[in-house]
Amino acid sequence: MIRRSTLIAVEILLGLVAAFAIGIGVAWWRLSQGPIELNSIRDHVEAELSEARSGRPVGIERVELAWSRRGNALELRAVGVTVEDGQGGVLSRSDEARIELGVLPLMIGRISVARAEFSGGAMTVTRKPDGAMHIAFGPEGSPADIVIPSRPQNETLEQRVARLLDGMEAAFRPVGPGGGLRGLSVRNAALTIIDEGGGGRWTADAANLQLARRGRNLELAANARLEGAEGLTAPASLRITTDTRFQSAVVEFGAQDARPRALFSPAALGPFAGLDAPMNATVSIGMDRERGVTLFEGEAVFGRGSAEMAGGEFSLEGGRVHGRYDIASDELIIDEIAFAGDRTRIGGEIHVRDVSAIMRAAPNEPAAFDISLPSVRFDVPASFPEPVALSNVRIVGAVVASERAIRFTQIAAQSGQGALTANGRLYWAEAGAGANRGTRMGLQLNGQVAGSLDAREVIQMWPIGLGEGAREFLARS
């Protein structure tokens, strides 16, 4: 026989369940009629978002509870979000912000924003002539929310890395350690990037930015379809991962089907400003507060296109380049290179010295280069009947765009017991008549061989189409 106290407890429990079910039903019906305004917590939400925006005043028209866009969950929305300058002026405006509140603070009656996703608004990134970086969550002309100072004189590499990591600490402050906000994102924002020193300018109508804290790691992810000079577009992405103590970081940049001129200003491209071909590129940079730069490597895959040089235009069949950059020695090390699609390959590591001097050269100034290859294997079926293997190769010269030529002041290589030395130039000039007139490539080379060179090695290095009778004679000998 059931005790009376047990029956009473069961009746109370059933009553609570019924009340809860009725409450859920009423809430579902009310939400189906439209959002429920919760303006009583507006001040709390404004304060939380203001703290995430470096203390800038944030205004909200109203806060409401509604079904998510997918209709399978509830979400809190801040409608009509504005970021002000502290004097009543509006710097940026977002249509709405979707907000996630922390569960544990709610249990003790405290409102704490855990994540916020803004829709719309504007962002501006400006690189100043002195190298300082200003990031503003607002249109062009807005005061910077984040400032990464310019590089001081006589700054060591380790000091520069430490300064960049300090700048990341400022950038990640909204979701940094010790705060309740774990995620901050902006969707479909108007993005403007300005390079005041190089003269470049890029815009995007629907840029996305996300700051997130996951355990002991912080992550910034951004993607946008940038529009640069001449209306060229470049889908680009950026990802920065660091730890909550900002001791190290990895920066990854990528671009898909982008023209170089859409990503970089002419000043940044230097002698390569005339390159016009679709490109997929990835660059990874690793930084450590104690060791400096620990990783700097990238890959670029080019499609068919053209290159302009002093009024002439030349066709490119595409190719692939992979390499890494040694900052301490200012040396670019290329470990994979292919041209003319995949038909032409160069095996071995190519060391390019004084890379910064090459990139600093203006488009109309000679760009000097110094290239060394400890051992290399040329596989160029269109020019040589067999792969050519050389060692101790060094090529010194300059790209002279004004002369439409590449000068070689020193070419040195070794094949077996023979040492080859040469100088000359590779040039382009108008040739032909009528419909056949066009830009043709020419080669002028003066060289000599010291030591002994096997006739078979000569045949391997003999260019196809040059003195075929002599080459056949050597082959029969």
Model-derived segments and spans:
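Solvent-exposed loop/turn segments connecting transmembrane beta-strands
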Residues: N39, G228-A234, G311-E313, G341-G347, ...
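Short edge beta-strands and adjacent turn/loop segments
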Residues: I60-A73
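Secondary-structure transition motifs
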Residues: E46, E51-R53, P57, A73-E75, ...
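N-terminal type II signal-anchor transmembrane helix
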Residues: M1-R53
